[in-house]
Structures are given as structure tokens and as C-alpha cells.
Amino acid sequence: MDILLRDLNPEDIEWIKKKTQNATSQNKFIKSLISEARIKEKLQLVRNSEKKNSYQDSNTPFSFIDLFAGIGGFRSALTFLGGKCVFTNEWNKYAITTYKNWYGDEESTNDDDIRNFNHSLIPNHDVLCAGFPCQPFSLAGVSKKNSLGRKHGFEDADQGNLFDCIMSIVDVKRPPILFLENVKNLKSHDKGNTWKHIYNEISSRGYEIFSKVIDASNWVPQHRERIFIVCFDKSIFCKDRKVNFQFPEFPTKREYSLSSFLEKNPDKKYMLSDKLWNYLQNYAEKHRRKGNGFGYGLVGNDGKTRTMSARYYKDGAEILIEQDGWRNPRRLTPNEAKYLMGFHDKYAKCFGHMNGFPQVVSDTQSYKQFGNSVVPIVVEKIMIQIIAEINSYRQDLNFKAA
């Protein structure tokens, strides 16, 4: 530890002393910095972030952090709109592989357990983005956990307390804007108590809260309902003014059709075997006779698919593409799944991928990643409305200054 301290610049040591109270806390602070033996780089990252927040400065792009980032649904959209990502956290090694390949980040991408990470090391930012894990609250996740006798919601020991981790970061960094996403079941989970807890935790910290369930099928050919939560720090945005944020209006026509990205000659491995296709048909018929809606989801070239889940890799039954003639239906290819989830080329080009985001993990991992992701174009449309509120705030600031 002494050797590392001697390696630091005097101004870095002085800065550490200001951030801590005594030698013990200094030691703990420095240990958290050297988890990857890159103390100088980490110090520079944090110190560079301690500047005027860009939501106040029209000449500076807004900054954001990407928590529980997955493969970067938030990252794609906000960068496309001119934002600068200053910190990313994701602990799944396969998602990290995709994320780093797509966005090229090394220094600002962190794969620690965010619950154990020193939150004071997170750079200052304007927008905290988090699609916090939905399995503890989703209908499918709750059903599975109940069948296994496991806890769900906030009682889920592995993932249920990650929302409280977000609140811990809010307490330390106090971002002006929170931009959160989860499954639509969040509001009804545990008879509304889950949503009450979330609302109260955010509200008690002085944020004005806006929430809405939005179906991505307004923009992409997939039925995918998610709740989006946008929060503004009242001490900033409600000071002698009112927040006029509104969620985006739905377009009259989707931006992308299924046929626009279906491959003409996909590999035969994606076509269902006779055995699997017969099984799925018999399974669907059995449940149809019982009056249940369980079964496969067959869709034509210009239809709207069911929701793609992280389980799609198992048999693909939720989204099957019709084929001509005698051929059995087929699964989506990973490339088609990418476009169905809204990771279109306009986002990829922002990061130098002129032919779209490449597949860098196995088919199985790709399906899992897309099934767990947020749809970038929905994030983009909501962020446009957030930017409008930021610009309105800036205008009010300039008006008062004049």
C-alpha cells in the first residue's frame, strides 16, 4: 500500500485526504481504487467528473451512467442523441464481452458487484440509467420462483435488493435525472406494495416521478410492454418552475417492419425439426382444448411477434417465422433478434460498426442478451422528451439570469 501511495502525484494524495476523514477511511478508499491495479486511471476518471453538471450548460453534452447495462440498450440510444457515458456496470461476463466489443469501453466499464463497489468512485453524471433486473417482479419470474419455493420481489436475495442499491448511488451522487425501466408487472407485484416502496423511496429523496407502461410495438414489430420511470430532482427542476415532462406520443406507423430485416436464406439449423414442430403443435392443441392460451407464436413476414424472452434459446416457440411450402417454421436468427429488439444500424454507426452491431458470443448467449434487453428506440423517444425538459430548464435559467 505504501508503495502505491508513493507512486501517486501529490495533488492526488491531497484530493484523497479531502474525500476521507482519517487514515483508516483513506486506506479503505484506496483499496477500492486498486481492485484492478489501475489507481491512477481511476483517480483521473473520478476527478475529471467533478465539473459543472452539463444539464446547466448548453455547450456540453449530457452525461449518463449505465447500470445493469446488459448489452447497452440505454447506451445505444443516449449516445445516438449526443450523450456521453461516463460509467458502466454489468457483471455478466458474456454481456460484458458484447458491450465492450460494441461500444469500445475499457476504463469506464466496471464488472464488479455494484453492491460492493465504492459508489463515491462513480463519476458525476446528469442521468442515471438503470434497467434493474426484472426477474424478481416479472410474471414469469414470480411463477417460476413460486414453483421452486423461492422468494421473489424484494425478498429475492440475489436480485431483489438491487433497486435499493440504486437508491444508495442516488444518495451519494445525487444525479439530477433518473431514467429507470422494468417489467409492466412492477406496479401490481405484491398487491402494489412493491411499487409503493419504489415510489416512496424515490419521492422521499426529493424527486418528481413520472411513470408509464409503453409497448415497444409502437415502433418495432414486437409486443413488449415495459414500465419506464423518469424522475427529476425537485431542488433543480422545480425551483420556481414546473416540470412539463411528457412521455412520447405513439406514431401512427411503426418505423420498422418484420420483413425489413428477415433474412432471405437463413441457415437451416434455425428451422424446427419435425419432432419439435409436432410436439409444439400437440402441446398447443392440448391447452387449447382446456381453454388455455399456451402455445407457440407463429408470425408472418409482416406480423407482430410476441415478447422475446431470455428463454428464447430453448425452443424459440414464442416467436416462430412462417416459411413457404412444406418447410417447418423457423426460429429467428440472432441477427434478426437484434433488429427485432431495435438495435438498428443507426446506433451501431455511432460506434464505428458500419454494417451493424456484430455477433460476438454464441447463439444461446445472444438470445439471452436480447431477451433481457431494453428496446433502444423506445429509450431514444423517451430521452428526447427528457432533453426537451433539460432545454426548457436551461431557457428558464437564462431568462432569470437576464
What would you call each of these model-derived segments?
Residues M1-T20:
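Short Lys/Arg-rich basic patches
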Residues L5, E11, A37-D57:
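RNA-binding accessory domains that recognize and position tRNA/RNA substrates
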Residues L5, K40-E41, K275-A402:
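C-terminal target-recognition/interaction regions appended to catalytic cores
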Residues W15, T24-L45:
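Short, basic amphipathic alpha-helical segments that act as recognition/interaction helices
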Residues K17, T79, I96-G104, F117-V127, F137-T307, R311-Y313, ...:
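Class I S-adenosyl-L-methionine
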Residues T24, K28, G160, Q369-I377:
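Short, conserved micro-motifs enriched in small and acidic residues
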